[in-house]
Amino acid sequence: MDGGNQSEGSEFLLLGMSESPEQQRILFWMFLSMYLVTVVGNVLIILAISSDSCLHTPMYFFLANLSFTDLFFVTNTIPKMLVNLQSQNKAISYAGCLTQLYFLVSLVALDNLILAVMAYDRYVAICCPLHYTTAMSPKLCILLLSLCWVLSVLYGLIHTLLMTRVTFCGSRKIHYIFCEMYVLLRMACSNIQTNHTVLIATGCFIFLIPFGFVIISYVLIIRAILRIPSLSKKYKAFSTCASHLGAVSLFYGTLCMVYLKPLHTYSVKDSVATVMYAVVTPMMNPFIYSLRNKDMHGALGRLLDKHFKRLT
C-alpha cells in the first residue's frame, strides 16, 4: 500500500492505540466491558421510559432518543475495534471507513443537538412552569427531534461526500481506534482547504450555536432559581437540571479535548481523549440520568421486577 495514489478500492489499516499484543488483550476486555455496560444501560433507559406512562414527558422523550443515539454511536465504532484487537487483519475497506465516518459525524452532531433541545426543555420547565404543557407539546417535541435528525444527517452527508474527493497517498496506516475525520484529513495528499473551511463553517452552526444556546438557557435557569425564596424549592429546581448539566459538561468537555486544536497538531495521544467522548460519555449517560432520579429508579425497578416475575 506504499507509494502512489490510492484508489477507492484500497483499504485502511486501523492500528488502534497500541500494537503490543499484551496491551491489545487488556484493551479488548476493557472495551468489551464498556460496550456491554453501555448497551445494557441505554437499553434499560429506553425500555423504562417506553414502558412507564409516568415517564411519558418531553424530558424523558428526549432522554430516550439520546440513549438510542448513544447506543447507535458505540455500535458503529466499538465492535469493529474489538475485532481489530483480536485479529491480525486490521484492515477496513475504503467504503467501510467512509460509512463509519458518516455515522460517527452524524451521531455526534445528533447528540449535540438533542442536548441543546433538552436544555430548552429544562429552561421552559424552570422559567415558565405554568406554560410548560403548551410550550412543550408532543407536536413540538416531534418537530424538534425531526429537525435534529435532518440537520445531523445533512451534516454527516456533507463531510462524507467531501471526503470522497480527498486523495490519499503512501501508507494508509491509521494509528487510531476508528476512521475519524481529522485523522483522515491529516493523511491526505490533495488540497483539503475546502474540507477544512466547510468543517469550520458547519461546525460553528452545528456545535457552537447549540452550545451557546445551552449556556444562555442555563444562565436564565440559574437566575430563575436564585429568585426562588425557599431553599428546599431551590434545591428541587436545581436537581431537575443537574443530570442534564452533568451530561452536557461531559459531552462538551471531552469533545473540546479532541477538537479544540489546530488540524496539524492532531496526534496519536488524542486517541485517549477520543475514547472519552466515543466510549466513556455514552457509557456514563445512563448513570448520570438515573443516579439521583427517583422517577427513573421507580421505572427501572418496575421494569426489572416485571421481567423477573416472568422468569420465575
UniProtKB/Swiss-Prot annotation:
CDD domains: 7tmA_OR1_7-like. GO terms for cellular component: plasma membrane. GO terms for biological process: signal transduction. Disulfide bonds join 97-189. The chain crosses the membrane at residues 26-49, 58-79, 101-120, 140-158, 197-219, 237-259, 272-291. Its main location: membrane. Gene3D superfamilies: Rhodopsin 7-helix transmembrane proteins (1.20.1070.10). Glycans are attached at residues 5, 195. Coiled coil: none annotated. GO terms for molecular function: G protein-coupled receptor activity; identical protein binding; olfactory receptor activity. Signal peptide: none annotated. It is found in: Cell membrane. It is a multi-pass membrane protein. Residues 1-25, 80-100, 159-196, 260-271 are extracellular. Residues 50-57, 121-139, 220-236, 292-312 are cytoplasmic. Keywords: Cell membrane, Disulfide bond, G-protein coupled receptor, Glycoprotein, Membrane, Olfaction, Receptor, Sensory transduction, Transducer, Transmembrane, Transmembrane helix. Odorant receptor. Belongs to the G-protein coupled receptor 1 family. PANTHER family: OLFACTORY RECEPTOR (PTHR48001). This is Olfactory receptor 1D2. It comes from Pan troglodytes.
